[in-house]
């Protein structure tokens, strides 16, 4: 994000975020296919090949060399964007149910009686993320960062409440539950594909030019920590209860994140944004 012109930064970060999020959707889909057809050794070999290809392609990227910036030997802002902490907390809360989804949704499906089509679920999620690029990047470039994030939050919130309700609906109307389950996949992709790249832009716009890398690092750290917490919490809640309760908890977290975003994050961004 630090090498793009300001006019196109929102769209550029959007494509970066899109690639990141689609990988998180395609990964479980491919993993499930390999698990059903081959051994774990094949899965790990494919992972190694994928990482090697990614490393080779990253090595081809050439960025202009910049003069090092003198800073204090040890300072908090070398590791985290202090102005981005409120947004980081909000993003972390949103990443928790995302982590639950990418890891446990296949087990949740089996628990409620959906035994086939998990590859379709992740495919629809990836398609939704691609669809989000049609409008969200341009909206961010027009300065509507907080509005785009809010749109994504509302959609994701509705999706998690719908996802948690599938267990109950399965007992009442199996066909309706299946439509909702796979519809949730598509709209979760749209919501997260809209929201996460816009969050990246929000972090970058809070940072001076010499801290744009720190801003992106803060964004990624919040996202990764949230996903990790989602793995732990999702497994724990499912162990003491059921997966639908885990997704209901995730839905409640998204409500909390919406309230916190409107009350704290958006006003803080409007006061402190640099571009």
Language model region names:
Residues 1-3, 194-207:
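Intracellular juxtamembrane helix-capping segments at the cytosolic ends
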Residues 15-59:
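Helix-loop-helix hairpin linking two adjacent transmembrane segments in secondary transporters
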Residues 155-173:
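C-terminal ends and interior cores of transmembrane alpha-helices
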